[in-house]
Amino acid sequence: MYNSIEVVHSKREGDSMKLKRSERLIDMTQRLLDNPHTLISLTTFTTLYQSAKSSISEDIAIIKKTFEKQGVGIIRTVPGAAGGVIFVPKIKREQALAAAEKLKEQMNDASRLLPGGYIYLSDLLAKPNVLHDLGKMIASAYEDKKIDAVMTVATKGVPIAQTVANYLNVPFVIVRRDSKITEGSTVSINYVSGSSSRVEKMELSKRTLPSGSNVLIVDDFLKAGGTINGMRSLIQEFDSTTAGAVVFCESGVSNHNVSDYSSIIKITEIDTESQKIKAVLGNFFVTHEFL
């Protein structure tokens, strides 16, 4: 289900004024980019720009063609009196692969090796351009799955989940391993950590996730899969469903106790003695379609 805009809710200098077509195209483009997955009625545009529907339709056709050509996204048209246009962020396959290849090369760095078979990712996940690419890739793959919320576990997965949620224009929820008094009442579950085989706890505020939600799980790293299994169990406790699970990086040298997930980068070899690490592209590019 899409959000909708009947009346433009952000005032800018020049609102409801007659603009030149070039100015109108720029302003319209920005409004679409600012409101992904949101139905904007043609009446909103005709009122805002004091232009005929035929002129607005021509403008939208120009933007639609350019967005698709440049790999920005697609514009869907909803017919009828209550119809309008919806901007859906998408990425071209070649753009996604090029971004992932750059990340893969940065992952092939032995200095990223941490004790216990973990990989240092914090520097990458602090870069806005990396988050932009990851967020758009994942959101593009799930744009037609009617996602209601993006879920991650504190703390390293938060930047990716927030970026994905921004592109999908849905809330993101943070699962914690220890409760905060500011969260109010919570729902908690026990799960088996795949990496340590210990029973651990995760919890989520009752007010965070409405019953019946379709949830996309996003995380930074997968070693054995216990965390993803735990989040799936927690989603069930909210009478909701898991639409999918995506991780930025997975360790292919560990035994996984989880299925039905995709990864953007996969570590296929770790040798702490010789300080060697090998990364390849994950199955994300096999299991998902792009623009």
Language model features: what each stretch is:
Residues 53-55:
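Key DNA-contact positions within bacterial/archaeal DNA-binding proteins
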Residues 45-46:
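The alpha-helix within a helix-turn-helix
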Residues 2-41:
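Extreme N-terminal segment that seeds HTH/winged-HTH DNA-binding domains in transcriptional regulators
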Residues 82, 86-146:
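Active-site-facing substrate-recognition patch
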Residues 170-215:
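Short, glycine/charge-rich flexible loops or terminal/linker lids adjacent to PRPP-binding catalytic cores
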Residues 50-51, 170:
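The short coil/loop that forms the "turn" connecting the two helices of the helix-turn-helix
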Residues 233-291:
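PRPP-dependent phosphoribosyltransferase catalytic core
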Residues 57-68:
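Residue-level detection of the helix-turn-helix DNA-binding "recognition helix"
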